[in-house]
Curated annotation (Swiss-Prot):
Subunit structure: Homodimer. Interacts with VP1. Interacts with VP2. Interacts with NSP2; this interaction leads to up-regulation of NSP5 hyperphosphorylation and formation of virus factories. Interacts with NSP6. Participates in the selective exclusion of host proteins from stress granules (SG) and P bodies (PB). Also participates in the sequestration of these remodeled organelles in viral factories.
Name of the protein this chain belongs to: Non-structural protein 5
Feature: compositional bias, Basic residues: 131-146
Chain sites annotated for binding Mg(2+): 92
Sequence positions bearing Phosphoserine: 67, 153, 155, 163, 165
Family: Belongs to the rotavirus NSP5 family.
Post-translation changes: O-glycosylated. Hyperphosphorylated on serine residues, when in dimeric form. Phosphorylation by host CK1 is required for the hyperphosphorylation of NSP5 dimer.
GO molecular function: ATP hydrolysis activity; magnesium ion binding; nucleotide binding; RNA binding
């Protein structure tokens, strides 16, 4: 049995910071692509400082700050700057104050390509070879080979009388002596077989 698992590609996460208004995030999982576009406001340093200084400490929330983690350091979103347009940061002026170079806006590319190949095959070969001598059964072992019964008559002209015949089955038999010798021998063989059993 062989089991092989092949992972062709591990998850790879790449992030680059660009100064662009729109960012496309594409997630690829097993050949399926999901794309979405989100609008971001450029992180102009001077405008950001003015905006943060114009707000009180109680009004500053998590949406007003950016993380130092390059994977999650997005620019300030539009809903974070709509509250104070006098600070110089707005959706209309953000495109003009933004340079055309592709630096500053977050772009996160997360691609997951995973191939799993499981091959389980069970190859079994069973070979049974039996070579044994043919053993004789107990009956064959106990069987005795008896000598061949042969009886010769002294006189071939002897005719069996009806009184000596077995139920009249051997009438006028000229081999009476041979017949009686054969019958006596058969009785002995039958008695010996009974004793052996």
């Amino acid at each position: 049995m062989s089991l092989s698992i092949d992972v062709t590609s591990l998850p790879s996460i790449s992030s680059s910071i660009f100064k662009n208004e729109s960012s496309s995030t594409t997630s690829t999982l097993s050949g399926k692509s999901i794309g979405r576009n989100e609008q971001y406001v450029s992180s102009d340093i001077e405008a950001f400082n003015k905006y943060m200084l114009s707000k009180s400490l109680e009004d500053i929330g998590p949406s007003d700050s950016a993380s130092n983690d390059p994977l999650t350091s997005f620019s300030i979103r539009s809903n974070a700057v709509k509250t104070n347009a006098d600070a110089g940061v707005s959706m209309d002026s953000s495109t003009q104050s933004r340079p055309s170079s592709n630096v500053g806006c977050d772009q996160m590319d997360f691609s997951l390509t995973k191939g799993i190949n499981v091959s389980a095959s069970l190859d079994s070969c069973v070979s049974i070879s039996t070579n044994h001598k043919k053993e004789k059964s107990k009956k064959d072992k106990s069987r005795k080979h008896y000598p061949r019964i042969e009886a010769d008559s002294d006189s071939e002209d002897y005719v069996l009388d009806d009184s000596d015949s077995d139920d009249g089955k051997c009438k006028n038999c000229k081999y009476k002596k041979k017949y009686f010798a054969l019958r006596m021998r058969m009785k002995q063989v039958a008695m010996q077989l009974i004793e052996d059993l």
